[in-house]
């Protein structure tokens, strides 16, 4: 079975995981809406992250910060001055491209070893390489580009009724800065001592020039970020801790060893503020792609906000009787990307006896969008089956389905990743029991209706 993005995207659209955005108006490039199953899957992924990184962690608390922030925030963070992509236009067809992507795509197509990432190259190095290798426009095939220019990735808008400079605001390009500006507030009100972390889930926006690969890279996306504050000198220890914690979280939810890798950034790839960065990447059908960036940001962010705002961002350690600006370890995860990774990892086509093929999503039960399918064997049994549904739906997202033969209903539930199906049959009226079918093994067992809640309690933990 070849696992392709075409198959996964087709299933996602057909079954209600993801729809093209604004579809009745012809769509809007690279926008996607999560459907009835997609929203459940993504919400379950976010709940699983919050559970392990905030709720169960003795170190961390959460916040939910505003998308619009004082523009000085982006001066301090460096986004207004340095958050940009190197762009060049084709003079023949007037298409615009990222210079670094042109080089990387050409290298992939020609099996050329670049000796590392293009991220650290200067504009001059990129332009010279494109000219030397005679890299052509992907749209028209000509080699006639403008010089490279830097294009800021932030979405700019205006607050209030007049569109002038003093009312300019930006849609946040990351959730992290809301955490940094609230560092002192959270530390004071939560009474947390360093080391501690602040987690946040929220939307961010980047005016990417080359988005693509379904929901992997979009201009509007959701992040699950933790900023972990620690004493300088302990940062590498905590970097190692959170790196492994992130890997363990992915494994616990079903990502396999051979589907992911941890890639350390080379010195030329590192952001100017980073002492070290590791990307946890997933092997999508289109190739390796970053899920999680784990960075040692040192004291850069709090120092910058202290300088620009004039507010003291230091922390006083009352046990050691010393004052310092904490270092920050940041594990930053894309909610849309990791949701797509779980979808790709779960997708399978199984050959059954007789040559039949079963399409199934092997989601971990904790993130499956529908936990239990309730299937009466006949519509005459709906009343009893509906009582089972009414009870279990208090605790789990269930789906009631009484249309079609039972075999086809099982296949439908397999295709959307439902871990368990309950069949309410004619014997159920007499013995007070139902048949529970396991999605992965397809094995069935008889369980008393009164015991169902207890039976399922352990099934959905991770």
From Swiss-Prot:
User: Which PROSITE patterns is this protein grouped with?
Assistant: AA_TRNA_LIGASE_II (PS50862)
Under which EC number(s) is this enzyme classified? 6.1.1.14
Chain ranges passing through the membrane:
none
Which CDD domains does the record cross-reference, listed alphabetically?
GlyRS-like_core, GlyRS_anticodon
Q: What Gene Ontology biological process does one annotation of this record name?
A: glycyl-tRNA aminoacylation
Localization per record: Cytoplasm
List, alphabetically, the InterPro entries matched.
aa-tRNA-synt_IIb, aa-tRNA-synth_II, aa-tRNA-synth_II/BPL/LPL, Anticodon-bd, Anticodon-bd_dom_sf, Gly-tRNA_synthase/POLG2, Gly_tRNA_ligase_bac, GlyRS-like_core
Detail which positions bind substrate: 98, 174, 221-225, 330-334
Q: Which residues bind ATP?
A: 206-208, 216-221, 290-291, 334-337
Q: What is its main location?
A: cytoplasm
Under catalytic activity, the entry for this protein gives:
tRNA(Gly) + glycine + ATP = glycyl-tRNA(Gly) + AMP + diphosphate
GO CC, sorted alphabetically, is:
cytoplasm
Return the NCBIfam families for the record. glyS_dimeric (TIGR00389), PRK04173.1 (NF003211)
Which family, according to UniProt?
Answer: Belongs to the class-II aminoacyl-tRNA synthetase family.
Question: Which HAMAP family does the annotation name?
Answer: Gly_tRNA_synth_B
- Job of this protein: Catalyzes the attachment of glycine to tRNA(Gly).
Q: How does it assemble?
A: Homodimer.
Name of this protein: Glycine--tRNA ligase
Can you name the source organism? Lachnospira eligens (strain ATCC 27750 / DSM 3376 / VPI C15-48 / C15-B4) (Eubacterium eligens)
